Amino acid sequence: MDKLTDLNYTLNVITLLNSTLHTILEDPGMAYFPYIASVLTVLFTLHKASIPTMKIALRTSKCSYKVIKYCIVTIFNTLLKLAGYKEQITTKDEIEKQMDRVVKEMRRHLEMIDKLTTREIEQVELLKRIYDKLMIRATDEIDMTKEINQKNVKTLEEWENGKNPYESKEVTAAM
């Protein structure tokens, strides 16, 4: 029944607004009609939307001050947007949240920079070791046996019993 009464009240207010606006329209000197109509519509919408919302929020919320502050900031931001401003009103909580987000992002960037510098230092050390190993050393005699893979090659005199291990042998197998 309460909702029906509220609906009737809303319809009566809309009818009153329409009749008022029609009487204003008949006056030919009224040049600001669209602006007045927009302001009245916004005020009526805010009135109808904010009062039930505030009642519910105050009943369910533990901290009514924060709810009221949030609702007022939202209403002012809406009015600023309707007026064409791009700036918004922010509360201290929102500013602290943004500052925390910025600080967290800066910490993440610092950690990334630290990791990158550590990797670069390791790469420089690795390049130094590679350079040290590649340095040309002066020697009197160059051992070419490593280059032609003859370090483990035996001559005929070094073979066991003087036999060539690569010659084929006769193998007998039992059937």
From Swiss-Prot:
Residues with attached carbohydrate: N8, N18
Gene Ontology biological process terms from the UniProt entry: monoatomic ion transmembrane transport; symbiont-mediated activation of host autophagy; viral process
GO function terms (MF aspect): channel activity; metal ion binding; toxin activity
Source species, domain of life: Viruses
PTM annotation: The N-glycosyl content is primarily Man(9)GlcNAc, with a small amount of Man(8)GlcNAc.
Cytoplasmic side: 52-175
Residue intervals on the Lumenal side: 1-28
GO cellular component: extracellular region; host caveola; host cell rough endoplasmic reticulum membrane; membrane
Main function: Plays an essential role in the virus replication cycle by acting as a viroporin. Creates a pore in the host endoplasmic reticulum and as a consequence releases Ca(2+) in the cytoplasm of infected cell. In turn, high levels of cytoplasmic calcium trigger membrane trafficking and transport of viral ER-associated proteins to viroplasms, sites of viral genome replication and immature particle assembly.
Similarity annotation: Belongs to the rotavirus NSP4 family.
Protein name: Non-structural glycoprotein 4
Annotated organism of origin: Rotavirus A (isolate RVA/Equine/United Kingdom/H2/1976/G3P4[12]) (RV-A)
Phylogenetic classification of the source organism: Viruses, Riboviria, Orthornavirae, Duplornaviricota, Resentoviricetes
